Amino acid sequence: MNALVNLLDLDADALTAYCGELGEKPFRARQLQRWIHHYGASRFDAMSDLAKSLREKLATRAEIRAPAAITDHLSADGTRKWLLDVGQGNAVETVYIPEETRGTLCVSSQAGCAVNCRFCSTGKQGFSRNLSTGEIIGQLWMAEFAMREQLGRGPKDDRVISNVVMMGMGEPLLNYDAVVPAMRLMLDDNAYGLSRRRVTLSTSGVVPMMDRLSKDLPVALAVSLHASNDALRDVLVPLNKKYPLAELMAACRRYLEFAPRDFITFEYCMLDGVNDGVEHARELLKLVADVPCKFNLIPFNPFPESGLKRSNNDQIRRFAQVLMDAGIVTTIRKTRGDDIDAACGQLAGEVKDRTRLVERGKFGKITPLVPVAASGQPREVRPA
């Protein structure tokens, strides 16, 4: 018996092709897509304007299956976090962040992450596998209709989720073939209808795929920078050894030729005594001098294996002031959902690690080299 086709895996073109295989005309695909993504239908017999013959075909050949919630936590500040079962011993986390004028969903793209950034708790679990398109868009599908139920909104009311950030577990550009169709559905007016400015992909700097994305589907781009020079970034973001800062900055400039926004957002995790000195801020000014940008400074959320500490608020403000004095728009991210471990860098989920990262002791005993100052010689810093 053939496996059922999960219709959440199909963007508009793929769904049209699938309906063609069933002997149906393209308008049936549009109807079907609307039932799934506008109304949250998971049963074909509820799709009243589809021909009965099509509903019967779909019932035996297809399904609408999003990842199932294992846990569902609501923070005191309204942040809501789901732990979602994606099978094979893996679970990923998805977070909804309410704000006064928008609702943002933070979406995962992989079970675990192979990039292994020094300050991120996702990386400490290693990497299992890429998520499918259905598992990615299924997070938005599940969260939108769960939030509608929570807030008492009907199918004709405005959507709850107005923004999506691909900033959850995983490196999206290392799962390109599943992430792009999922984002096409986010942008599709017959699905979620988000603008390219309201879908943000965050990358640690996979340069070739940044170039590819700029041609295929240029959404808003955020780059996980976190360091002002290669020596430091090699330690904090190991991918930098493959795509150093000069290549990354050049890729950012190329991306802006196609981007829906006229700036790149640089994310910068503030680590006490590591990357938070005024000298680092000054070096950043030189690094991004010809890249229109804004900075999002992120107070570090500690976890035991990191051996790192959060910069104090005064130091973060001093750092931000250097950037702002140079005319760079700079924000300090407000910590949300930390009472349910939903803040930035805290998403961990459950990962059946194929890389055996934890087993091989890749955390806890690391003593990375970090510069004393931006222009100084590296010294050894042992975990706290």
Curated annotation (Swiss-Prot):
Keywords: 4Fe-4S, Cytoplasm, Disulfide bond, Iron, Iron-sulfur, Metal-binding, Methyltransferase, rRNA processing, S-adenosyl-L-methionine, Transferase, tRNA processing. InterPro entries: Aldolase_TIM, Methyltransferase_A, RlmN_N, RNA_MTrfase_RlmN, rRNA_lsu_MTrfase_RlmN/Cfr, rSAM. Its EC number is 2.1.1.192. [4Fe-4S] cluster binds at residues 113, 117, 120. Disulfide bonds join 106-344. Gene3D superfamilies: 1.10.150.530, Aldolase class I. Its cofactor is [4Fe-4S] cluster. S-adenosyl-L-methionine binds at residues 170-171, 202, 224-226, 301. Transmembrane segments: none annotated. One of its GO terms (biological process) is rRNA base methylation. It is found in: Cytoplasm. Binds 1 [4Fe-4S] cluster. The cluster is coordinated with 3 cysteines and an exchangeable S-adenosyl-L-methionine. GO terms for cellular component: cytoplasm. GO terms for molecular function: 4 iron, 4 sulfur cluster binding; metal ion binding; rRNA (adenine(2503)-C2-)-methyltransferase activity; rRNA binding; tRNA (adenine(37)-C2)-methyltransferase activity; tRNA binding. It catalyses: adenosine(2503) in 23S rRNA + 2 reduced [2Fe-2S]-[ferredoxin] + 2 S-adenosyl-L-methionine = 2-methyladenosine(2503) in 23S rRNA + 5'-deoxyadenosine + L-methionine + 2 oxidized [2Fe-2S]-[ferredoxin] + S-adenosyl-L-homocysteine; adenosine(37) in tRNA + 2 reduced [2Fe-2S]-[ferredoxin] + 2 S-adenosyl-L-methionine = 2-methyladenosine(37) in tRNA + 5'-deoxyadenosine + L-methionine + 2 oxidized [2Fe-2S]-[ferredoxin] + S-adenosyl-L-homocysteine. Residues 99-339 form the Radical SAM core domain. The active site is at 93 (proton acceptor), 344 (s-methylcysteine intermediate). Belongs to the radical SAM superfamily. RlmN family. Reaction proceeds by a ping-pong mechanism involving intermediate methylation of a conserved cysteine residue. Specifically methylates position 2 of adenine 2503 in 23S rRNA and position 2 of adenine 37 in tRNAs. m2A2503 modification seems to play a crucial role in the proofreading step occurring at the peptidyl transferase center and thus would serve to optimize ribosomal fidelity. This is Dual-specificity RNA methyltransferase RlmN. It comes from Cupriavidus necator (strain ATCC 17699 / DSM 428 / KCTC 22496 / NCIMB 10442 / H16 / Stanier 337).
